[in-house]
Each structure stands twice: as structure tokens, then as C-alpha cells.
Amino acid sequence: MTLLCRLLKQLPTSEHSAEELDNLLAGKLGFLSFTTEVMTQPDVDGVRPYLLVSAGALSEKIDALASLPREVWSSTLLLDADADRVRDVLTQIRIGLEQGFINNGHSAALGRAMSYSSPSAVVCEQLSGVDFYLFLRDLLDHFDERLEGLRTKLAELAGRIFVSDGCLASFTGSDEDFDAYWDAAGDLGLDAGDGAGAGRDALVVPTPCDRHEAFVIPSDICFAASACDPRRLGLDVTGAWAVAANALSYDYLWNEIRVKGGAYGCGFRAAGERQTAFYTYRDPAIDPSIERVARAGEWLGSFEPDEAAFEGFIVSCVSGMDAPVKPYALTKRRNTTYLAGLDPHAREERRAQMLAATPGELRSLGADVTRIAAESPTCVFGGREVIAKSNAGFNVVDLLG
């Protein structure tokens, strides 16, 4: 599905060559993207993957907003895709992933560590993480013999995905633009489909397991992450956790891992109610940081900040929530709230909890932070020598071959 998203817009349609299409999109639309999104669900084991088509245009170009995305998803010549063009796009994706592993390994480590316990993160890994990279690399290694099957699979996927069954539409604009868009778009040219809904409900996700991996990349430093869904541990992550994350990140972890340990960066995240994670960025060693993370809860349990510092932690949390967003970004946030089954009032409640947080409340979280550090699976991306010096018993994987 990721390859389908990346190849749409890059190939000719039944109406335009690839160059003509590129010029049309640049002249008529502000943007057009095809991406995958994986939504966590109220059930900790629930997973809802989506293919997201996003587009924007000026009011006077509403007709193009209705017609061009439809042309791309419905008439791209996937069965006749040019081999060299497909290979080039796939190679660009591979290079981008490899650069991400090398330069932003903490993000890759966070995603991989989450996949050790979260079904939704397993799907994310298959769509855009290490699993996808390994699939892509193998595909490129056997490109000529697999090209015809790839073309057929892409066309079959497009036929199953772009149907009205299960399709949701979201529009951001004035009432006049809304009416004009739907007058032009009609039914979006989507057929009813033949069992697409059943296929969606029948998604089977491999059971997560802690692989305890260390991926070798060309580097003399490492990136590490320990992550989990706090619901697995029976923890309710309130707004006070965000304040605790700030205190841990900019006080304890900063001093212990960055200043004393020599890492370029580090932190603790409490992202909403469905992810908690420790991470390090460009760290010269693995084991010392793991030991310091293990002591984070003990530090928080005896946290005695001065009033000004504590207010600073709260203000930085709340200001992040209060930062103005453009209408499209606000719509994306609301869409995520709906699709992930989140409480629509949770954001306001979380903000109020941040403002009401006290040092005593943060101290009470110390034991839970210790438990998160102890029970969250860990993943590392790093240089071979750095990994070899660790005694943490990682399963070492030569990622880039």
C-alpha cells in the first residue's frame, strides 16, 4: 500500500503523461498527497489503517480539486508502469529510509520499540518502518523478476481501496466552497466495491513480541528508545504526565545523559494516553544511558523544584497546546480524534490537568515511571562498535546489508 501511495502522481494516467500531470497538479492545486495512517483504538489491541488522500486548492479552482485527485486514483496506468520509473521511485524511497535511520535513528527506534508490544505499531512498521525497508530492499534486489507481479498487485490494490464502501470524506472551507466541491465531485467516481469492507474487517496483524534488536548503521554513535502503550501497564496518562515529561527531559535526563553522558539529545515522552517512551539521540554509549533511564522514576519521586522552574514546565506544556494552527491542521487533528476513537473533550481536560499539576502529583508518578523504564521494550540503532560494547544482550541486525 505504501508503494501504491508513492507511485501515484509519479506515473501517467489515461488522460495525461506524467509530465503533463505534474504540471497540472502544480498549477491547479496547492498540494496533493497519498499517505498511509494507522490509528490506535480504545481497545489496546485495536488497529485501523487508512489510506489518506489529501488535497488543497484556491476557491476558484474547486473543479480541479474535485477532478485531479480522482483522475490520479482512478486512471493511473499501474499495469503499464514504466520499469525504469518504478525502479527510480523505489530507489529514492530506499535512500530516504536509510538516511532517516542514520540521521534520525531515535524516531526509527521509537517506532520499532513500540512495535514490540503494540499491534498498531506493528502495522506502522510494515507500512513505513524497518519491516517496510526490508521488504523494499528485497524487492529492488529481485526487481526484474518481480516487476510484473508488482504491477498486478498495485492495480488490484487500487481497485479494492478506491471504492465508496468504507470511504470517509472531510472538507475544510466555506459553505459556498463545500457546495461547489460536492456539485463538481459527485460520488467521487467511486464504485460500491465487492467485499472491500469484509477485507478491511478481516485484517490480521502479527502478534507483537519483544525482539530486543540493535540495528547496525554506519555511525560511531547510537540512538536508543524504550517505548510502550501505558494501557498495557494499566496506567492512566493524564495531563500531569506531560509536565513530568518536561521535568524529566529538561532536568534529570538532560543532566545525566546529555551533560554527563555526552549524548546530543534525550527525553521522555508521554504522548496523549497511548504512548510513553524514553529515547536518546546521538549517544556515544548504550548501557550507561539505560542505567540512567532506570533511575528516572527515583529522581521524580523526590522531585522538589522551585516555584519558578515548576511554572516554566507547566507553561511550556500548555503553550504547546495553545499554539495557533491553520484550519487544515485543525481538521487533521479532529479527524484523528474521530478515527482513533478519542474523547473529543480529552484535549481540554488534559490542558486543565497540566495547569492543575503540582510537584506532589509529579512525585506520585515516580513509581510508575520506574515501572515504564523497567517494562518497556528497547530498540537501538547504532554503529557496530558501540553496539558491541553493550552488555544488554541485543539481537544484532545488519540493517543496511
Q: How should these model regions be labeled?
A:
Residues 7-8, 25, 29, 73, ...:
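Hydrophobic, Leu/Ile/Phe/Ala-enriched alpha-helical segments that form helix-helix packing faces
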Residues 356-401:
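In a subset of proteins, long, contiguous C-terminal domains/tails are tracked
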Residues 1-144, 164-173, 223-243, 253-359, ...:
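M16 family metallopeptidases and their MPP-like homologs
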Residues 152-160, 166-168, 212-214, 253-254, ...:
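Generic recognition of flexible, low-complexity loop/linker segments
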Residues 145-153:
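Short linear interaction motifs
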